[in-house]
């Protein structure tokens, strides 16, 4: 573990990765209360002048890997999962608009009646104008997770950090739900994560971040105000950097 006293920077442009399961409140479908709370937190950050892009999973609707285990072709089940991410994206867009935050959804699969196509230069312009950009439909290709989408989009739009929102406080040396004495890392390097066999994101996403020196901040979304704290550089969660 690196020195917990190391200063953290505040961030100007962030990529927020949200798990789809959180949007469902642990159930299939959408929990409006959860989506509203997330929208309120994002609106607070945007009001402070931070540029925010978002990638949401689709696990509250479909999980491609699980459907594959039941005999469905993996590619088809992944496409179903991508559609789930679009439903989540549109829901978050609606709640953000109600907060007075101008929001655009860009999808990797063309669906012109509900969203813009993914265009990184346009996404950057939206961010510069203070709009939130939500990236839906994953990478638009099967076999790639939304973690990987988050890493790739963060790199392409020039984000300062990937904010990995979880239902736990950060990265631990053991599962805190099983081991009561598990210790949370305040800060750790990409290399140390691999050496210690810790789980931060899937392997492809993590490799993208490590190879391109993209920091990852893992934090608990369920604590209200944590998105603003993370963006401001407060010492919450676990910061993974080179």
From Swiss-Prot:
Compartment(s) of residence: Cytoplasm
Protein's pathway: Pyrimidine metabolism; CTP biosynthesis via de novo pathway; UDP from UMP (UMPK route): step 1/1
Predominant location category: cytoplasm
InterPro entries cross-referenced by the UniProt entry: AceGlu_kinase-like_sf, Asp/Glu/Uridylate_kinase, Uridylate_kinase, Uridylate_kinase_bac
Annotated positions binding UMP: 58, 78, 139-146
EC number: 2.7.4.22
Keywords (A to Z) from UniProt: ATP-binding, Cytoplasm, Kinase, Nucleotide-binding, Pyrimidine biosynthesis, Transferase
Transmembrane segments: none
MF (Gene Ontology): ATP binding; UMP kinase activity
Catalysed transformations (reactions): UMP + ATP = UDP + ADP
GO biological process: 'de novo' CTP biosynthetic process; UDP biosynthetic process
Cellular component terms (Gene Ontology): cytoplasm
Activity regulation as described: Inhibited by UTP.
Gene3D superfamilies: Acetylglutamate kinase-like
Domain of life: Bacteria
Binding site for ATP: 17-20, 59, 63, 172, 175
Pfam families per record: AA_kinase
Task of the protein: Catalyzes the reversible phosphorylation of UMP to UDP.
Subunit structure: Homohexamer.
Xref: PANTHER family: URIDYLATE KINASE (PTHR42833), URIDYLATE KINASE PUMPKIN, CHLOROPLASTIC (PTHR42833:SF4)
The name this protein goes by in its record: Uridylate kinase
Organism, as annotated: Nocardia farcinica (strain IFM 10152)
Lineage: Bacteria, Bacillati, Actinomycetota, Actinomycetes, Mycobacteriales
């Amino acid at each position: 573990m690196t020195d917990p006293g190391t200063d953290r920077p505040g961030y100007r442009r962030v990529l927020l990765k949200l798990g789809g399961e959180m949007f469902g409140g642990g159930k299939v479908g959408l929990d409006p209360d959860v989506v509203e709370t997330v929208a309120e937190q994002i609106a607070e950050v945007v009001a402070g002048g931070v540029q925010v892009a978002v990638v949401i999973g689709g696990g509250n609707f479909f999980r491609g890997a699980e459907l594959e285990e039941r005999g469905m072709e993996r590619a088809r089940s992944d496409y179903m999962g991508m559609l789930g991410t679009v439903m989540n994206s549109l829901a978050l867009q609606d709640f953000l608009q109600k907060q007075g935050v101008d929001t655009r959804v860009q999808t990797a699969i063309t669906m012109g009646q509900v969203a813009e196509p993914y265009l990184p230069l346009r996404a950057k312009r939206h961010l510069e104008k203070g709009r939130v950009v939500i990236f839906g439909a994953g990478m638009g290709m099967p076999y790639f997770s939304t973690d990987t989408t988050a890493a790739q989009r963060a790199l392409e739009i020039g984000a300062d950090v990937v904010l990995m929102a979880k239902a736990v406080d950060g990265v631990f040396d053991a599962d805190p739900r099983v081991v009561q004495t598990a210790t949370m890392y305040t800060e750790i390097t990409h290399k140390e994560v691999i050496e210690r066999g810790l789980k931060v994101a899937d392997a492809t996403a993590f490799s993208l971040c490590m190879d391109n020196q993209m920091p990852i901040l893992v934090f608990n979304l369920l604590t209200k105000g944590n998105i603003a704290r993370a963006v401001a550089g407060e010492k919450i969660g676990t910061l993974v950097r080179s």
